[in-house]
């Protein structure tokens, strides 16, 4: 079954379930979902999945309990609850085994990385949002978040990661994994969201470009593009290492520059300034500063491309797709006091940064969770915006 068919089946099932729920069945499912999550987290914490042989082999519960050093009775209860999600299975003779789904979280390193990050880092933040709201109320401070509550720190998310190499390693692995494996956020969607060929020979500035995945992809696909990767010193060193392994015809068109996007943009009059999954990490006040730094460097024909989520209006489309986007919106709140934005919020953000900045187009490629917002400077403020 391909992704489109799978998504359609899941959506229809979700809609049917919503229609037939009553308060009792709703609460029963709600509690079960919480238990299911915590059981999967327990399995990950004690490395249970790695102690189960690959299909079609199976193993006695007692043997897994001994290997993982966990109580047998707890292992049985936890594993059997996890099975109600479709993860793992039990043979007719009462042994524990992987099924097709659970085996992929062992054999596929990207799926394993994402599972571990979600259960260890993402979901625990949900419990901190109540405490953060009670403590700080209406705040946009990046160090007054659910993340601060859960980790007991006064540092912002990225500053705290600098002090915790273990968390930083997991976060970086998760981001790289999503970029290459998660169909909704795969960097390749950028290729189809904008007419790069129409630029001809052009300069593209990849702001916050990290280790260079986006720039390398663009340089490989479009031989007339020259790229500049901008980021802080540490990720820039990673980009240098990656570029050293590339063919000369690609790396010769990629420049690397240490840069803090809260400072003036050093590259003037570039054809494209690209912000890919950057602005959703920042509250409006900080996002405006980032955009203003770019606007000051833009020429009359420069384009600002923002690749980020554009939230749908509530109930305007697929429930499951909307839920997937809104859980990421909440993660932005919990980590940064930032947000994913709707079209009108993007329009307002750009206008606050500079009234001349007008949206020309918004494109979400098929299968992508992210949209590409194209904006240019318009010296005629009275002219209507794209939408």
Swiss-Prot record:
Gene Ontology MF terms in the entry: O-methyltransferase activity
Keywords tagged on the record: Methyltransferase, S-adenosyl-L-methionine, Transferase
Positions bound to S-adenosyl-L-methionine: 231
Annotated knockout phenotype: Leads to an alteration in the product spectrum, with an accumulation of 6-O-demethyl-10-deoxyfusarubin and 6-O-demethylfusarubinaldehyde.
Pfam families tied to this protein: Methyltransf_2 (PF00891)
Superkingdom, natural source: Eukaryota
EC nos: 2.1.1.-
Transmembrane segments: none
Active site positions: 280
Any one Gene Ontology BP term: methylation
Recorded metabolic or biological pathway in which this protein acts: Polyketide biosynthesis
Induction: Expression is repressed under acidic conditions, while the expression is induced under alkaline conditions. Expression is induced in presence of sodium nitrate, and repressed by glutamine.
Role this protein plays: O-methyltransferase; part of the gene cluster that mediates the biosynthesis of fusarubins, highly pigmented naphthoquinones responsible for the coloration of the fruiting bodies. The non-reducing polyketide synthase FSR1 is responsible for the condensation of seven acetyl-CoA units to yield a haptaketide. After rings A and B are formed by aldol-type cyclization, the PKS-derived product is released as 6-O-demethylfusarubinaldehyde.
Family that this chain belongs to: Belongs to the class I-like SAM-binding methyltransferase superfamily. Cation-independent O-methyltransferase family. COMT subfamily.
UniProt name for this protein: O-methyltransferase fsr2
Native species: Gibberella fujikuroi (strain CBS 195.34 / IMI 58289 / NRRL A-6831)
Taxonomic path: Eukaryota, Fungi, Dikarya, Ascomycota, Pezizomycotina
């Amino acid at each position: 079954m391909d992704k489109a068919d799978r998504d359609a089946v899941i959506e229809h099932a979700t809609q049917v379930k919503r229609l037939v729920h009553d308060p009792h069945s709703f609460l029963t499912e709600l509690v079960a979902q919480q238990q299911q999550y915590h059981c999967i987290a327990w399995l990950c914490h004690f490395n249970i999945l790695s102690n189960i042989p690959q299909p079609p082999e199976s193993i006695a519960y007692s043997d897994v309990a001994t290997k993982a050093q966990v109580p047998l009775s707890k292992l049985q209860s936890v594993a059997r609850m996890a099975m109600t999600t479709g993860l793992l299975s039990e043979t007719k003779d009462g042994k524990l085994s992987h099924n097709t789904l659970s085996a992929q979280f062992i054999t596929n390193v990207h799926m394993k990385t994402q599972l571990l990050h979600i259960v260890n880092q993402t979901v625990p933040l949900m419990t901190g949002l109540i405490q953060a709201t009670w403590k700080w109320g209406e705040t946009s401070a990046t160090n007054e978040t659910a993340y601060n509550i859960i980790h007991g720190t006064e540092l912002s998310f990225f500053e705290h990661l600098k002090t915790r190499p273990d968390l930083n390693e997991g976060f970086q692995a998760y981001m790289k994994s999503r970029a290459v494996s998660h169909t909704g956020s795969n960097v390749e969607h950028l290729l189809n969201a904008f007419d790069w060929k129409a630029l001809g020979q052009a300069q593209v500035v990849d702001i916050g470009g990290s280790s260079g995945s986006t720039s390398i992809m663009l340089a490989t696909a479009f031989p007339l593009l020259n790229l500049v990767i901008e980021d802080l010193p540490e990720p820039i060193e990673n980009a240098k290492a990656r570029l050293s392994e590339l063919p000369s015809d690609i790396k010769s068109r990629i420049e690397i520059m240490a840069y803090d996007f809260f400072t003036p943009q050093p590259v003037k009059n570039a054809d494209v300034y690209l912000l890919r999954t950057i602005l959703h990490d920042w509250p409006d006040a900080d996002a405006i500063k980032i955009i203003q730094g770019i606007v000051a460097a833009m020429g009359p024909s420069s384009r600002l491309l923002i690749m980020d989520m554009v939230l749908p209006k509530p109930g305007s489309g697929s429930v499951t797709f909307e839920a997937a986007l809104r859980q990421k919106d909440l993660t932005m709140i919990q980590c940064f006091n930032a947000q994913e934005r709707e079209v009108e919020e993007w329009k307002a953000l750009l206008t606050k940064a500079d009234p001349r900045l007008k949206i020309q187009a918004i494109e979400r490629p098929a299968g992508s969770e992210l949209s590409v917002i194209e904006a240019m400077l318009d010296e005629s403020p009275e002219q209507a915006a794209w939408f």
